[in-house]
């Protein structure tokens, strides 16, 4: 219900896919909705739409930035993510010893606000600031004090955005200048999560598996490990399992 209040199109999704999203929520221990931990986004199922002759919409679970922080925190990891903007001092070197130095500069944002003048709405400011992003990075610290980094360049972020399912949908968070910073922070954190020590953290391991499945072109319909109430009742509809 809360997901439908945030995005009414969710209520148009096929019930089986909504049920599978609820299962993912329960598996990961992440609430659905405005808390930003797990979102349900509607995506058109082109194959079923052609078969049915009417638009068929699937619900897809999307782990939010706050969801990843919660999942990784269960392994005792402390997580930070930041954005590096054009004009801010920056040094990043890989090798036997990683080096990351970033000095945030509030004057970058202040300059944008001054340039916009009376038109400096939050969305207008973020629209320009988003264009100035040059890197996104995450920092993870283990309970033993080991710190690791993950850095994505602007080119990598743009590629991730271009490959995101539903990126061009009217309600895609990628198209919202206020949501875009959270999306790129989530993107770099998702990539970092695949390299972090999460053995024994079943929810985090499952989250990584789900993200990898969807990134590889899989769908909620063929995601392994989910119960299918229609199949259990012997009433599975054609196409629901593929």
Task: Name the predicted role of every residue range.
Residues 203-242:
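Glycine- and charge-rich intrinsically disordered segments
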């Amino acid at each position: 219900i809360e997901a439908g209040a945030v995005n009414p199109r969710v209520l148009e999704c096929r019930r089986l896919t909504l049920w599978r999203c609820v299962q993912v929520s329960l598996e990961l221990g992440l609430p659905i909705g405005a808390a930003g931990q797990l979102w349900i986004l509607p995506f058109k199922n082109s194959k079923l739409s052609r078969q049915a002759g009417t638009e068929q919409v699937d619900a897809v679970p999307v782990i939010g930035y706050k969801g990843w922080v919660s999942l990784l925190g269960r392994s005792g990891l402390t997580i930070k993510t930041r954005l590096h903007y054009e004009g801010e001092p920056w040094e990043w070197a890989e090798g036997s010893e990683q080096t990351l130095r970033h000095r945030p500069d509030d004057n970058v944002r202040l300059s944008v606000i001054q340039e916009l003048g009376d038109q400096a709405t939050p969305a207008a400011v973020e629209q320009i600031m988003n264009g100035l992003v040059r890197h996104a990075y995450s920092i993870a610290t283990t309970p033993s004090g080991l710190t690791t980094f993950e850095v994505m360049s602007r080119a990598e972020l743009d590629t991730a955005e271009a490959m995101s399912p539903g990126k061009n949908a009217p309600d895609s968070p990628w198209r919202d200048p206020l949501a875009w910073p959270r999306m790129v922070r989530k993107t770099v954190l998702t990539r970092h999560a695949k390299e972090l020590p999460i053995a024994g953290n079943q929810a985090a391991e499952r989250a990584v598996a789900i993200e990898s499945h969807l990134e590889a072109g899989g769908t909620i319909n063929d995601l392994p490990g989910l119960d299918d109430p229609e199949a259990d009742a012997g009433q599975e509809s054609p196409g629901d399992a593929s």
